[in-house]
């Protein structure tokens, strides 16, 4: 059997999805708190930048993968308007439920779908914009997921990946201290779940760096791939176009 990484642990590929599911079932009800802890609240600015770069227009079809509590979905649904079609999707039932309920509470009526990014249940050339925010690093076969995102994008459509990445070297020591010492402590104190937060920190370190992910997107068939480093490389937004 093939091996892969679950944080710093080496596991069977067939086991990773179950382990990741366990983490997100555990953190679903505290996911927004988790984002605040992991990013010191900066995730709102990173998402706002992503929303601006997506440039969703009225009538657009948008697929939000690993959409979680629906921050991007909400913004996209408002931008696409009543003539648009915005899908809120996640592979994790707990996350999907929390996000769906939150969207409804805010008056956003848009379809929610349980969706595996490695087997996207939509036809070719369907979406104007395909996004995944803070989800790619948890996927077992990132190359397959990227190829699927490209497949369902229309010609001229954009694929966008917002993800924790590799920080600039001067920040590395402080970032490691925060990730491996402070974050698990905060997870234990506020969510009673140090292990899940420890995994999330480890998963960031195992994720491809900015240039490697750019190459992976190009290998998936995307063109004009570029990325923006945000907050000193703590996060990067990658964008590619399907021609």
Swiss-Prot record:
PROSITE patterns: SAM_MT_UBIE, UBIE_1. S-adenosyl-L-methionine binds at residues 69, 90, 116-117. SUPFAM superfamilies: S-adenosyl-L-methionine-dependent methyltransferases. The keyword Hydrolase does not apply. Pfam families: Ubie_methyltran. HAMAP family: MenG_UbiE_methyltr (MF_01813). This is Ubiquinone/menaquinone biosynthesis C-methyltransferase UbiE. It comes from Burkholderia multivorans (strain ATCC 17616 / 249). The gene is ubiE.
């Amino acid at each position: 059997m093939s091996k892969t990484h679950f944080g710093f642990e080496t596991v069977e590929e067939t086991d990773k999805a179950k382990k990741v599911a366990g983490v997100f079932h555990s953190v679903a009800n505290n996911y927004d708190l988790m984002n605040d802890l992991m990013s010191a609240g900066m995730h709102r600015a990173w998402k706002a930048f992503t929303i601006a770069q997506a440039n969703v227009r009225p009538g657009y079809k948008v697929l939000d993968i690993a959409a979680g509590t629906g921050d991007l979905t909400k913004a996209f649904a408002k931008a696409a308007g009543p003539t648009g079609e915005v899908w809120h999707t996640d592979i994790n039932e707990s996350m999907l439920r929390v996000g769906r309920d939150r969207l409804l509470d805010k008056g956003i009526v848009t379809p929610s779908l349980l969706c595996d990014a490695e087997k996207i249940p939509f036809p070719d050339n369907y979406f104007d914009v395909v996004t995944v925010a803070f989800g790619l690093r948890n996927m077992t076969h990132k190359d397959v997921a990227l190829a699927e995102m490209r497949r369902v994008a229309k010609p001229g459509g954009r694929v966008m990946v917002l993800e924790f990445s590799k920080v600039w070297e001067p920040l590395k020591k402080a970032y490691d201290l925060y990730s491996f010492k402070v974050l698990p402590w905060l997870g234990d104190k506020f969510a009673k779940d140090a292990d899940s937060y420890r995994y999330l920190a480890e998963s960031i370190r195992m994720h491809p760096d900015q240039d490697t992910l750019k190459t992976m997107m190009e290998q998936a068939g995307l063109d004009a791939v570029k990325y923006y480093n945000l907050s000193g490389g703590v996060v990067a937004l990658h964008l590619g176009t399907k021609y």
